[in-house]
Design a protein with these regions (language model features):
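Intrinsically disordered regions, especially transient/low-confidence alpha-helical propensity segments
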Residues: 1-2, 49
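Enriched for short, Lys/Arg-rich terminal
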Residues: 2-7, 11, 18, 22, ...
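N-terminal first-folded block
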Residues: 8-39
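A short, surface-exposed loop/turn module that caps and links secondary-structure elements
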Residues: 30-54
Length: 81
């Protein structure tokens, strides 16, 4: 699998602290090895067909599509409570 960043994703990522960005990159490494890695808690995002969400930490999620052997990272944002 490979990762592709959708337009604007990296700009959204820059809004977070270096600590959060490091956590994000760690989670992406888990994603590349195993979509079902326990710390990702990856699941289909219920409001949009075909879009998945995974955890960076308790409060931050990233959203992605799976097309063939590519993860397309769409957005990263604070999870609403």
């Amino acid at each position: 699998m490979i990762v592709w960043y959708y337009i604007g994703f990296k700009e959204s990522l820059k809004k977070f602290s270096p600590e959060v960005r490091n956590k994000f990159y760690k989670q992406v490494s888990f994603l590349l090895r195993d979509l079902r890695h326990p710390s990702l808690r990856a699941k289909k995002y219920e409001e949009a067909r075909g879009i998945w969400q995974a955890r960076v930490d308790r409060n931050i999620r990233f959203y992605f599509l799976i097309e063939g052997n590519t993860y397309i990272l769409l957005d990263i944002r604070t999870h609403p409570k």
